[in-house]
Amino acid sequence: MEREQDTPWTRSTEHTNIQKRENGQPTQKLGRPNLIQLMDHYLRIMNQVDMHKQTAFWKQWLSLKNPTQESLKTRVLKRWRLFNRQGWTS
C-alpha cells in the first residue's frame, strides 16, 4: 500500500481517516481537507503575508532621514504603481 508523502500540505490538515489494512491492523491516513479547512489555511497564510508586508513597509519609512514632502510623494507614487501594476496617468 502506498504511503502519502509528508508535505506541509498534508501536515497542515488535521483531519485523519483510519483505514484497516488487509491484515486487519489500523493505519492512519491523512484525508483531503474540506472547504472550511482550506479557507482557514488560506486566511492564516495571507494574514502572515500581510503582516510581513506591513512590517517591511514601515521599516522602510522609519529608515528615511529627514524626508522632504517631494521625496515622500515620489516614494508613495512608486509604491502605488508597484502594487497596482498599472500605468500612472498624471
Swiss-Prot record:
It comes from the Viruses. Residues 1-33 are annotated as: Disordered. Disulfide bonds: none annotated. Belongs to the influenza viruses PB1-F2 family. Is not encoded in all strains, and seems to be dispensable for replication. Plays an important role in promoting lung pathology in both primary viral infection and secondary bacterial infection. Promotes alteration of mitochondrial morphology, dissipation of mitochondrial membrane potential, and cell death. Alternatively, inhibits the production of interferon in the infected cell at the level of host mitochondrial antiviral signaling MAVS. Its level of expression differs greatly depending on which cell type is infected, in a manner that is independent of the levels of expression of other viral proteins. Monocytic cells are more affected than epithelial cells. This is Protein PB1-F2. It comes from Influenza A virus (strain A/Turkey/Minnesota/501/1978 H6N8). The gene is PB1.
